[in-house]
């Protein structure tokens, strides 16, 4: 059986990891073993936080809508219930943007939902 020399394959694999780890502090960006650990952790964090970002933005939108709704004398849950009954199909992201950018329009939405 002939000997397998992994020169090119191993070097490409290591260089790929080191390229990803470029800019990390100290040995974390220079030494393969520590860079590999840092890259694996970074990719895990990135995967987890892509899922978390969706939750975080939804929480932010709800907090903004709630604050604006209370300024108009209504709670968040009542507003959302009234919007559903009035068959107003506007999502939380758009409601939050209305509340921040154009409070008059948001007030119109609130009054429309009360009818």
Curated annotation (Swiss-Prot):
UniProt-recorded name of the protein: Large ribosomal subunit protein bL20
Organism of this sequence: Prochlorococcus marinus (strain MIT 9211)
GO biological process: ribosomal large subunit assembly; translation
Domain of life (superkingdom): Bacteria
MF terms (GO), sorted A to Z: rRNA binding; structural constituent of ribosome
GO cellular component: ribonucleoprotein complex; ribosome
Family stated for the protein in its record: Belongs to the bacterial ribosomal protein bL20 family.
CDD domains associated with the record: Ribosomal_L20
One Pfam family, short name: Ribosomal_L20
Task performed by this protein: Binds directly to 23S ribosomal RNA and is necessary for the in vitro assembly process of the 50S ribosomal subunit. It is not involved in the protein synthesizing functions of that subunit.
Keyword terms, alphabetized: Ribonucleoprotein, Ribosomal protein, RNA-binding, rRNA-binding
